Amino acid sequence: MPRSTPLDRVRNIGIIAHIDAGKTTTTERILFYTGRNYKIGEVHEGAATMDWMEQERERGITITAAATTAHWEYAEQRYQINIIDTPGHVDFTAEVERSLRVLDGGVVVFDAVAGVEPQSETVWRQADKYNVPRICFVNKMDRMGANFDRTVQMIVDRLGAKPVPIQLPIGAEDRFQGIIDLMENKAIFYMDDVGKVQEEREIPAELAEKAKAAREYMLEAIAETDDELMMLYLEGEELQVPELRRALRAATIGNKLVPVLCGSALKNKGVQRMLDAVVLLLPSPLEIPVTKAVRPGVDSEAEDAEFIERPADENAPFTGLVFKIMADPFVGKLAYFRVYSGKLETGSYVLNTTKNKRERVGRLLQMHANHREEIKEVYAGDIAAVVGPKDTFTGDTICSPDDPVVLESIKFPEPVISVAIEPKTKADQDKMSIALSRLAEEDPTFRLNTDVETGQTIIRGMGELHLEVIVDRMMREFKVEANVGKPQVAYRESITRSVDIDSKFVRQSGGKGQYGHVKVKFEPSGEGEGYIFVNGIVGGVVPREYVPAVEAGIREAMETGVIAGYPVVDVKATLFDGSYHDVDSSEMAFKIAASMALKDGVRKGGPQILEPIMKIEVIVPEDYMGSVIGDVNSRRGRIEGMEARGNAQVVRGFVPLANMFGYVNDLRSQTQGRATYSMEFHHYEPIPRNLQEELVEKARS
């Protein structure tokens, strides 16, 4: 069966923003207007289609990226829009990361009252990383304090972007009535509650001057990106709408300009125009850079790496990237994937080149949040889910077994917080390990391990809310009862100076002995650089077959730490000398010698403990400003800056995570519940000496 929508009329987009900017409400309206829903689901009533997990409906926030397919008609042509609604809470940043990796365009939703918020900045940087073209939708124009112009200015100041408003609001707050279309130079008034009845009129006289200036700015910004239009503009020619749209589309796809629209999703104003902008301005899979891959076993980072192109063409070999795993209560494990090239039919086989495993494609599903529709095949540019793959996980490449390639995977941040968790009964124990393993399959930023000394299960994640949701799901979905400990900080160990270590492991016990001897130089590799191993052996003083064992011995010893039991990071190890014994040397002996070298190296290399530092933003009424700043300082925080936002103040700064547990309750009581805050991991830095000694002492005892 051929594809129902031509590829040039397919759009893969994400709805992305800060928590509470109105992403899910916007998506709900899109589903309503595209005919996917007959009744609008309201987030504040707990009825949103895209928020289908119980935890999401209770908290009114989006936790997992839900995918759905909708259709939109524009100029008598039918477009297919695959939408991913992503979470805005910083603890679920992995969901945003994996969604952006497979999208072609984004709709960034801003709250017209708050403007650009911290998670908006994080999301914007993530979109920059993947070069995702985007349009902005300034939402909540009906709210008290809504300010379109200020939000546009914040996009310039905070995000360093070049926003171009292509619409202006008519009125604001409870007098928000419609929008001015600057392209068409006309006003659109909304005449009913669901936004379906619209009336086109002349631009109101009181806004004529402002609209003229805004249109002039828009024309100039678009003309600057297109030589042909620039010539016409300078010659004073009237620029035609089709030419302007063509140039704006090219500038948007090339990430030179960001079109800005406005509306109120809750009041059903401006959403249809935003859908028009999605099909008019965001790219189809044919317009994004051609996907590049390497053959299995080739390091894509190497200078001489040879890349293979995978065009968005259904006749090319099949290539896809798995970006999400989900346990579905009805069909079992689901793997969401994006098809970059070729087509895939049910009943065929794919090769998972990341794991080198063949998988049979049993059933293919097109997802609508958590409703599913069986399909027989998927084509280049589609987003779909396959049921029940055994060995396939997030970030894996699946492709045609006859033409294997590996796509760039998805990189996720490391967890910064951990808690111990214990089952309440023996029956819960087995269920708990199954539940946690399943949840770890779904979420790459959630890790679990067993503490070797205490035997406790330790779960690690991106923040308190992240782990709270994981534990909640474990109890509800898998019916496990458990006790959860207090959150712990993910400290790290590192070194401050370079040191040469001579380490020898010799064991003679009659018969074949053990002999491994290495000389390793350890030095700091730089913040965030991780573990770097360099083989500096010349002349075979350590035979080549033992070098991987040395590298592994150091890496494994780094995991358990040295001075206080925290993982060692940011160390460069250079193996420069050593010796071996013809009979007694073995991989194990060299591994043990290397492990001893690392422990010695950390002790002698000026060891220090690093702690995670969080970037925080507190929005606080003027009256409570002093006590909030005093409190941040008392938590070893440092204030970076302050600015007024409406009648509140925004305080920005950095605070160690160790001092932020329970902050939400303290802030509420200090400000009578009138302040809000958000925080995200920013970097690691050395802990003060007195606190380091406390941690070392605690580890010893």
Curated annotation (Swiss-Prot):
Chain segments annotated as coiled-coil in the UniProt record: none
Q: Which HAMAP family match?
A: EF_G_EF_2_B
Q: Provide this UniProt record's keywords sorted from A to Z.
A: Cytoplasm, Elongation factor, GTP-binding, Nucleotide-binding, Protein biosynthesis
Listed under GO biological process in this entry are: ribosome disassembly
The record lists GTP as bound by 17-24, 85-89, 139-142
User: Mainly localized where?
Assistant: cytoplasm
Gene3D superfamilies in the record: 3.30.230.10, 3.30.70.240, Elongation Factor G (Translational Gtpase), domain 3, P-loop containing nucleotide triphosphate hydrolases, Translation factors
Q: What is this protein called?
A: Elongation factor G
- What's one GO-annotated cellular component? cytoplasm
